Swiss-Prot record:
HAMAP family: UPF0386. InterPro entries: YjhX_toxin. It comes from Pseudomonas aeruginosa (strain ATCC 15692 / DSM 22644 / CIP 104116 / JCM 14847 / LMG 12228 / 1C / PRS 101 / PAO1). This is UPF0386 protein PA0712. Belongs to the UPF0386 family. NCBIfam families: PRK13687.1.
Length: 85
């Protein structure tokens, strides 16, 4: 599956335990997203456009109104990266 660099960065942060928080307008449409890594830092590469592409590809999912997390398809699509912790 073709995954762009911003999508890959977002998936990598989610695979390590991050989540995508979202804000909805009065009609229920998602208007803003914020991607946090496991340490609580904000990832700037995660825009609304990147989020919608990940959601349309089925790489992230949300259950019962909770923040979006990586799905099994997302775990399979993410490429390994070195973690310099």
């Amino acid at each position: 599956m073709n995954v762009s660099k911003p999508e890959q960065r977002t998936l990598h942060a989610l695979a390590q335990g991050g989540h995508i928080a979202f804000l909805r307008d009065a009609s229920g449409k998602i208007t803003r997203v914020e991607c946090y890594n496991r340490d609580g830092h904000l990832l700037l590469d995660c825009t609304l456009a990147v989020f919608s592409r990940l959601k349309n590809k089925g790489l992230v999912h949300s259950r019962q109104g909770r923040p979006y997390r990586i799905s099994m398809a997302g775990l399979k699509a993410v490429r390994p990266q070195a973690d310099n912790r």
